[in-house]
């Protein structure tokens, strides 16, 4: 009788135990070990010329943060629509991309687009106007926001507080890897990329895999088009690594990953 009980208990434990590999992949990242989000800012030509074809070639989806007033949005609107139809997120990067000109090193900020001269009402209205434009392009209502220049305050007021219900989340510019529980959905961390090699980009992904965290890349130029740039080879190497390890890495637009984080935090 004792042997029978012992056998039954052992069998139960064996059936309920999870392999180590499975234990590492359970969690908030779509049952994978980590999440990687590829974001591209400012609505520049190389997004459509270089990035979208590269992502589509390996069947990965990214997030493109569009400045509504950018001539590239108006001139190539059908291409942006097609990108959205293929699963890429068109995120909101404000209508005019206002940055705080009162901060050090902000000589590039024009008086018309100086966030420090804005009222909160104006900032919120312009972001909502850009949402209307984006909805006209892609027909979607759920999307994320990215702070122009990472600036979050106007006169000490966090203007996004009035926009919480308009977006799933907002992406910031502070580098760092975080678990789902650690993420601040009003200011998601991201790594700004400028000149890194493919090996360095892949290294960041490996750290996310090891720590079970979310990694958000913030790109501007890819193969040119912006002073903040990564070369095509490095970007291609990153995409190839992500594709080769897609069983372990969840690569998705910011809106999808943020929605998953929100659901995890609300449990």
Residue ranges and their predicted role:
Residues 14-29:
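Bacterial Sec-dependent signal peptides at the C-terminal "C-region" and cleavage site
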Residues 37-44:
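Active-site-adjacent substrate/metal-binding segments within catalytic domains
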Residues 190-195:
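Extracellular glycoside hydrolase catalytic/binding regions
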Residues 34-35, 56-155, 165-166, 174-188, ...:
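Metal-dependent polysaccharide deacetylase catalytic core of the NodB/CE4 family, i.e.
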Residues 25-28, 62, 71-72, 135, ...:
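C-terminal domain-boundary segment and adjacent tail
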Residues 48, 52, 77-81, 124-134, ...:
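Generic structural signal for well-ordered alpha-helices
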Residues 5-16:
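Bacterial N-terminal signal peptides
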Residues 117-124, 198, 229-232, 236:
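Non-membrane alpha-helical structural segments and their capping/turn regions in soluble enzymes
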